[in-house]
UniProtKB/Swiss-Prot annotation:
Organism of this sequence: Bordetella pertussis (strain Tohama I / ATCC BAA-589 / NCTC 13251)
GO molecular function, one term: phosphoglycerate kinase activity
Keyword annotations of the record: ATP-binding, Cytoplasm, Glycolysis, Kinase, Nucleotide-binding, Transferase
The keyword Kinase is assigned to this record: yes
Native organism taxonomy: Bacteria, Pseudomonadati, Pseudomonadota, Betaproteobacteria, Burkholderiales
Oligomeric form and interacting partners: Monomer.
Cellular compartments annotated: Cytoplasm
Protein name per the record: Phosphoglycerate kinase
Residues given in the record as ATP binding sites: 203, 325, 351-354
Similarity comment text for this entry: Belongs to the phosphoglycerate kinase family.
Binding site for substrate: 26-28, 42, 65-68, 119, 152
Catalysed reaction equations from the record: (2R)-3-phosphoglycerate + ATP = (2R)-3-phospho-glyceroyl phosphate + ADP
């Protein structure tokens, strides 16, 4: 999968000594009301790539987007200043913040500077060629270490990579591409995918793409309700998309023709209303009443999925199978999560809700790989080319 140049290979070969290295990281972190960083995972994840370049004797420039500022009109709230401070603490050295950096940056070997929010530059979002060429002129080596933005063709993720003398993947991006390639391009069978979420329409292209590849396609959440409708089961007043039933049937049909399966729930957990205090009732799937809402899979279905997952060679997990935020509707997602943790197969998980479930059940160490990309992870599952990766592949060819 990763037929790209890598920062680790360049560092090992001694090619970075005295060179100017430009790293596009993903430092788009959340802030609390007082303007303090509330969660710094992405900043910590960027440190190995920065250290690698510093230890190899490079002069290092790092940039990232933060939020969605107006190009050419950054405000104080859009500034990477708090990120520079946190990065200084993590690296144990001063990290200067450089504003207005497109026309030139002074940085010495062994030093690292943070270039102010790249989305402040006019032309960033449009992947402007003039801006891309100017940024490429700042460096000897361009590094993309931001998988989370790999599905976007912007000046710092795509354009600069076309014109920099050398363009490569940082360690974070390299690990992500290796894990995704292992899961989808050369998977150990059986390959099981779990796709949860509220709407078939938003995940339809993923479901269609996976229907050609996987041995078991487990659907969860509102998506499962639409598949239950397609299988002729009652769903009461559950969240579903009746207009997507034909598409759901087509996915089931593709799987069936390949000797593969979409396991439809045989029992479910229902409530009369949606909320933290709603009373939960387990019912056979055929017995759902008109005023019922399906909010989780039942214990029998959960056990069946656990058995499938325990014997899987590869697992791709995107989305919970129930409303796991409420404990009475969390059993299905917990059983699935623990089965993934116990499976001997290679697992890759991605998407915000999935990461929240992994954190809730404390299984991060037992998950093969946790993807840092939301939209990029989904587009990869769809089989789409990611512009930021495609340009690195083209430069390595």
């Amino acid at each position: 999968m990763s037929n790209v140049n890598t920062l680790s290979a360049l560092a090992k070969s001694g090619a970075l000594s005295g060179k100017r290295v430009f790293i596009r990281a993903d430092l788009n972190v959340p802030f609390d009301d007082a303007g303090r960083i509330s969660e710094d995972t992405r900043i910590r994840a960027s440190v190995p790539g920065i250290r690698l370049a510093l230890d190899a004797g490079a002069a290092v420039m790092v940039t990232s987007h933060l939020g969605r500022p107006k190009e050419g009109a950054l405000t104080e709230a859009d500034s990477l200043a708090p990120v520079a401070q946190r990065l200084s603490e993590l690296l144990g050295m001063q990290v200067r913040l450089v504003p207005d950096w497109v026309d030139g940056v002074s940085v010495e070997p062994g030093e690292v500077v943070l270039l102010e929010n790249c989305r402040g530059n006019v032309g960033e979002k449009k992947d402007d060629e003039g801006l891309s060429r100017k940024m490429a002129a700042l460096c000897d080596v361009y590094v993309n270490d931001a998988f989370g933005t790999a599905h976007r063709a912007e000046a710092t993720t795509h354009g600069i990579a076309r014109f920099a003398p050398v363009a490569c993947a940082g360690p974070l991006l390299e690990a992500e591409l290796d894990a995704l390639g292992r899961a989808l391009h050369d998977p150990k069978r059986p390959l099981v995918a779990i796709v949860g979420g509220s709407k078939v329409s938003t995940k339809l292209s993923i479901l269609q793409s996976l229907a050609d590849k996987v041995d078991q396609l487990v659907v969860g959440g509102g998506i499962a309700n639409t598949f239950m409708l397609a299988a002729g089961l009652p769903i009461g007043k559950s969240l579903a998309e009746p207009e997507q039933v034909e598409q759901a049937r087509a996915v089931i049909e593709i799987m069936k023709r390949r000797g593969a399966e979409v396991p439809i729930p045989t029992d479910v957990v229902c409530a009369k209303s949606f909320g933290a205090d709603a009373a939960a009732t387990v019912k056979a799937a055929a017995d759902v009443a008109e005023d019922d809402m399906i909010l989780d899979i039942g214990p029998q279905t959960a056990q069946r999925l656990a058995d499938i997952l325990k014997t899987a060679g590869t697992i791709v997990w995107n989305g919970p199978v129930g409303v796991f935020e409420f404990d009475q509707f969390a059993h299905g997602t917990e059983v699935v999560a623990r089965a993934i943790a116990d499976s001997a197969g290679f697992s890759i998980a991605g998407g915000g809700d999935t990461l929240a479930a992994i954190a809730k059940y404390g299984i991060a160490d037992q998950t093969g790989y946790i993807s840092t990309g939301g939209g990029a992870f989904l587009e990869f599952l769809e089989g789409k080319a990611l512009p930021a990766v495609a340009v690195l592949q083209a430069r390595a060819a």
